[in-house]
């Protein structure tokens, strides 16, 4: 069962050349990227005593906004995306900046099922896929025993519709119009149900909010709009 939403792919295909333009279609991701990286690295270093040989998988990597900086810091990163044009953009940027990383054009379904990783990352992806439950199950099956995963997405709440779609897309123009579909947003409780009997435990939920007074993004306990989900797999 494929997780590919062809309409979503077509949408991102048109702007796949623009990933590293901080003033372009993905400008908002550049704004939140330092916080995303800081959160991911904090979770990795808190969970593992020795990070020198860790293998990281970034699913739906886009142009490599997370994968390339992680690899630049010495992590062993494999990053996959369904769009070949995204992989070409990511590969070119990494090469230009002397970063060693393994970029692959692949869906999570096409990835070898017996290959496990210490860390699995999937940021701002699950709200763009079909068959989301199967996608998430395929995602977590690649986590090693005692491994971790970090997912980020948007909550399906009224506030998320107002801020994530009306304000972000139509008023402020932070992202292109029609980037998001409210019906595809997921509540944490829904992901929790999908993970039942998988041996995966949700250890933390952390919100990401925009502080208008300070004109900055920051982590928060408010998960009404954007949120991170930190997962751990048991040792069995």
Swiss-Prot record:
Its EC number is 2.1.1.222, 2.1.1.64. It catalyses: a 3-demethylubiquinol + S-adenosyl-L-methionine = a ubiquinol + S-adenosyl-L-homocysteine + H(+); a 3-(all-trans-polyprenyl)benzene-1,2-diol + S-adenosyl-L-methionine = a 2-methoxy-6-(all-trans-polyprenyl)phenol + S-adenosyl-L-homocysteine + H(+). The gene is ubiG. It comes from Rickettsia canadensis (strain McKiel). GO terms for molecular function: 2-polyprenyl-6-hydroxyphenol methylase activity; 3-demethylubiquinol 3-O-methyltransferase activity; polyprenyldihydroxybenzoate methyltransferase activity. O-methyltransferase that catalyzes the 2 O-methylation steps in the ubiquinone biosynthetic pathway. One of its GO terms (biological process) is methylation. This is Ubiquinone biosynthesis O-methyltransferase. Keywords: Methyltransferase, S-adenosyl-L-methionine, Transferase, Ubiquinone biosynthesis. Pathway: Cofactor biosynthesis; ubiquinone biosynthesis. Belongs to the methyltransferase superfamily. UbiG/COQ3 family.
